[in-house]
Amino acid sequence: LSRNNNVYLGLDGFQRDKTEDSKISLNIASLFATPSGEEVLSYLRSITIEQVNGAGVSDAELRHMEGQRYIVGLLESRIRHAHRVKNDE
């Protein structure tokens, strides 16, 4: 999160209203707080962040995998952000 010259950048690096950014995080946290949501997030993590590529991986494959990892990491960051938002209320 960054706040420069009254510009609020969300976790994803996009400029938006701070309230809207918090709402996005709260919605994501709510979605993944269910038992099914927790299982889905665990599955996504297992096939992205926890996946190890061998030395023979191509540049294109690696870029594809890193994009997937970024999205799952962003979801997890949004969940942590939502917990901070709730604690600040």
Question: Model segments located where?
Answer:
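Intrinsic-disorder/low-complexity detector
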Residues: 1-89
